[in-house]
């Protein structure tokens, strides 16, 4: 039980800190833009690996390029997280694409374009 609470807290801290790095332009790669968001983080039960799911309101190759850039900068990102979060072992990060946000915008656009007729 205690391990699950620790895992959950660490996941939310990682979401917050990685999001702050992206937002404050702590990552200098131009492919990492302000339209990115950390959707969720999933840490393995042994707390060694973490999957970081990245979403964007921009569609297509922009998100793929940003995920590649984040994976290239994961050593730097882990170093920054070590400075900001006091944890014995920081999980190894891997960044993955998450299409939840773009799908939500797409569904919202469809709903807005529906015309309801008064009967």
Swiss-Prot record:
Keyword Cytoplasm applies: yes
GO terms, molecular function: ribosomal small subunit binding
Domain of life: Bacteria
Entry-linked InterPro entries: KH_dom-like_a/b, RbfA, RbfA_dom_sf, Ribosome-bd_factorA_CS
Alphabetic keyword roster: Cytoplasm, Ribosome biogenesis
Major subcellular location class: cytoplasm
Protein localization: Cytoplasm
GO cellular component, as recorded: cytosol
A Gene Ontology BP annotation from the UniProt entry: maturation of SSU-rRNA
Role: One of several proteins that assist in the late maturation steps of the functional core of the 30S ribosomal subunit. Associates with free 30S ribosomal subunits (but not with 30S subunits that are part of 70S ribosomes or polysomes). Required for efficient processing of 16S rRNA. May interact with the 5'-terminal helix region of 16S rRNA.
Quaternary assembly: Monomer. Binds 30S ribosomal subunits, but not 50S ribosomal subunits or 70S ribosomes.
Annotated NCBIfam families: rbfA
Family under the similarity heading: Belongs to the RbfA family.
UniProt protein name: Ribosome-binding factor A
Gene: rbfA
């Amino acid at each position: 039980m205690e391990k699950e609470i620790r895992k959950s807290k660490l996941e939310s801290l990682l979401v917050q800190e990685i999001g702050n790095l992206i937002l404050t332009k702590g990552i200098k790669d131009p492919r990492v833009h302000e339209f990115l968001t950390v959707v969720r983080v999933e840490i393995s039960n042994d707390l060694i690996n973490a999957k970081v799911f990245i979403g964007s309101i921009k569609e297509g190759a922009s998100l793929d390029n940003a995920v590649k850039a984040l994976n290239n900068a994961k050593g730097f990102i882990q170093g920054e997280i070590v400075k900001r979060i006091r944890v014995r072992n920081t999980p190894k990060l891997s960044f993955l694409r998450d299409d939840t946000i773009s799908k939500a915008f797409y569904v919202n656009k469809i709903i807005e374009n529906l015309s309801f007729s008064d009967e």
